[in-house]
Amino acid sequence: MSTYFIGDIHGCYDELQTILEKVAFDPLIDTLWLTGDLVARGPSSLEVLRMIRRLGNSVRIVLGNHDLHLLAVYTGIMRNRIKDHTIPLLTAPDAEDLMNWLRYQPVLQVDNKKKILMAHAGITPQWNIDTALQCASEIETVLRSESYPLFLHSIYEDIPNYWSNELSYRARLQFSTNVFTRMRYCFPNGKLDMLCKDIPNKAPEPLRPWFNLPSTIVEKYSIIFGHWSSLLGKGTPTGIYGLDTGCCWGGKLTLLCWEDKKIIQIPSQKKRNKKCSYLCYNGKGKKN
């Protein structure tokens, strides 16, 4: 009975299969936690979603920014990008079922017994655990409602970038979504910086990685996150694990076994084409 964590899959189905076979994952007794960004950039997003859905209650997922973007494309809010390789998923006969299943997934997972917290990008030092749970619940509630397309319209905004209990409901949703799915750096006062994507030793002053600022949550929980592939799983404090190691970019898919803290990595099968191009997709299984 083991607990496994896997970093961002990004449609890398073959690598996912290989790493699960390597640890002899058994969905009847083991639990698999996934850091989000299940889809896009890799070649097999459809197969990844189908596989994860079949695993049922043995899997605990959080949504990443690419998963939310996929929902925005499916609803016709955003245009599909050829580099995401998601047309087979968007036009599949079971696309609607998969999209509905996806939007019912959480943005935060917490195991209070093991004292583990998982979010795709991380947790802002401005929150305590109760605020984090409340903000996650607000996002999950709107995603599961009929008005979720209206919410998806706003997920590309960078403001507000500072937490306050006085924020409006819409502003709370935007800030929380950026924390859970897009955040990397903060200013010393906790204010989010949504622009810098460099590795920490190249980031301009006074920016700090979110995990290097004092936090009541970090003091009490181990934190698992993905999103930040350029970290290569390194440079985080004790008890904080960054598991995105850029499989879709020709890097590796990373698995952490919680019980012995052993790290297993599977090399990407090939480097992906980073050239950005676009294909018009107008939602609900239609493409031009």
Curated annotation (Swiss-Prot):
The entry's keywords: Hydrolase
Enzyme Commission number(s): 3.6.1.41
Lineage of the organism: Bacteria, Pseudomonadati, Pseudomonadota, Gammaproteobacteria, Candidatus Palibaumannia
Protein name (record): Bis(5'-nucleosyl)-tetraphosphatase, symmetrical
Organism: Baumannia cicadellinicola subsp. Homalodisca coagulata
Gene: apaH
NCBIfam families for the chain: apaH (TIGR00668), PRK00166.1 (NF001204)
Molecular function, one GO term: bis(5'-nucleosyl)-tetraphosphatase (symmetrical) activity
The UniProt record lists the keyword Zinc: no
PANTHER family: CYTOCHROME C5, PTHR40942
Heme is among the record's keywords: no
Record's function text: Hydrolyzes diadenosine 5',5'''-P1,P4-tetraphosphate to yield ADP.
